[in-house]
């Protein structure tokens, strides 16, 4: 079986290692020839996973022509690159039988769509699955225990993809609810930023836990509005991923929120950070107008948007959010 992964960052490489440990040969696509040479010759990916040796059966390429004939193609690019990646696959003549996986987190930046809908725009006949879970890429690469949720509408796809990943160290669950998992993947980075700010501003762990709980409510509300009839928050990829992202200070979005919480305005920190690397910044910009349009009380989204995109004072935005949540629960 030929399996390709597009995106040789930390998470894409970690996914490749999970498959390689189950003796599947994996082709890892990266745009940079030097990166390809490092993976193929040294079996390392030092920029993203230092001190990790990659299995020899992982091979890298910088040519789309090398992967379009693969039976399974998993996309692990930043969310704002998914549409271009799908278009590229179509232009290179990908088979209608190829199974497309999405492991990217976030929403489409051009049309504010779920990433699964972007795939349908160009590859409507291809089977599709979403893969996510509460995993830090470095721990997965080390071979530590982890859990994954495989979401697909077709039962056969769910079963087959789950079987590829399952091992004594990898717990897999399956669901047909592809909507809630994608919504949670977008929301969780925003919630993590606010959680990081909460701790930096010394509101305490109680407040942080309350914000995470509110975040779950907002995920459910948005998922229903997006078409999920019965949002399943119990999956590893929903509540599990949210807990990990919000509580692990090594998580990129939580760390960003904590650093941001040392200041009063985003502009005080923005010169020292690359917003393209913080998915929560991009997600807040996309989700804010959608939640307003859908008339949803997503107070965490409104707070994050105010801070990150509307010049809001951080402490004032947090206080406003807490008051609105408090008022709503009465």
UniProtKB/Swiss-Prot annotation:
Protein name as catalogued: Glycerol-3-phosphate dehydrogenase [NAD(P)+]
Top-rank lineage group of the source organism: Bacteria
Residues engaged in binding sn-glycerol 3-phosphate: 105, 133, 188, 241, 251-253
PROSITE patterns linked to this entry: NAD_G3PDH (PS00957)
Keyword Nucleotide-binding among record annotations: yes
UniProt GO BP: carbohydrate metabolic process; glycerol-3-phosphate biosynthetic process; glycerol-3-phosphate catabolic process; glycerophospholipid metabolic process; phospholipid biosynthetic process
GO CC annotation, single: cytosol
Positions that bind NADPH: 11, 31-32, 105, 137, 252, 277, 279
Catalytically driven reaction(s): sn-glycerol 3-phosphate + NAD(+) = dihydroxyacetone phosphate + NADH + H(+); sn-glycerol 3-phosphate + NADP(+) = dihydroxyacetone phosphate + NADPH + H(+)
Gene designation: gpsA
UniProt entry tagged with the keyword Lipid metabolism: yes
Molecular function GO terms recorded: glycerol-3-phosphate dehydrogenase [NAD(P)+] activity; NAD binding
Regions crossing the membrane: none
Pathway participation: Membrane lipid metabolism; glycerophospholipid metabolism
Active site: 188
UniProt-listed NCBIfam families: PRK00094.1-2, PRK00094.1-4, PRK00094.2-5
């Amino acid at each position: 079986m030929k399996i390709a992964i597009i995106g040789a960052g930390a998470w894409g490489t970690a996914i490749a290692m999970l498959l390689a440990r189950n003796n599947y040969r994996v082709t890892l696509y990266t745009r940079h020839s030097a990166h390809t040479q490092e993976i193929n010759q040294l079996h390392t990916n030092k920029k993203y996973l230092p001190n990790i040796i990659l299995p020899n059966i992982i091979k890298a390429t910088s040519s789309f022509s090398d992967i379009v004939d693969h039976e399974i193609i998993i996309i692990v690019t930043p969310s704002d690159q998914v549409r271009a990646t799908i278009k590229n696959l179509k232009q290179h003549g990908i088979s209608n039988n190829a199974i497309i996986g999405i492991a990217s987190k976030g929403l489409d930046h051009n049309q504010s769509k779920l990433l699964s809908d972007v795939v349908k725009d160009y590859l409507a006949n291809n089977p599709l699955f979403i893969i996510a879970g509460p995993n830090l890429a470095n721990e997965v690469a080390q071979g530590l225990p982890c859990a994954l949720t495989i979401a697909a509408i077709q039962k056969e796809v769910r079963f087959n993809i789950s079987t590829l990943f399952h091992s004594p160290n990898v717990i897999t669950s399956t669901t047909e609810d592809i909507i809630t998992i994608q919504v949670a993947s977008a929301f969780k980075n925003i919630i993590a930023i606010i959680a990081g700010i909460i701790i930096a501003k010394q509101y305490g762990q109680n407040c942080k836990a309350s914000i995470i709980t509110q975040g779950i409510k907002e995920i459910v509300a948005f998922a229903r509005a997006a078409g999920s009839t019965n949002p399943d928050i119990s999956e590893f990829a929903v509540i599990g991923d949210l807990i990990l992202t919000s509580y692990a200070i090594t998580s990129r979005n939580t760390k960003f929120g904590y650093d941001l919480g040392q200041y009063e305005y985003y502009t005080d920190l923005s010169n020292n950070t690359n917003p393209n690397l913080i998915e929560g910044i991009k997600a807040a910009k996309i989700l804010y107008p959608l939640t307003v349009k859908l008339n949803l009380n997503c107070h965490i989204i409104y707070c994050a948007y105010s801070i990150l995109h509307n010049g809001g004072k951080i402490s004032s935005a947090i206080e406003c959010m807490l008051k609105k949540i408090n008022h709503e629960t009465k």
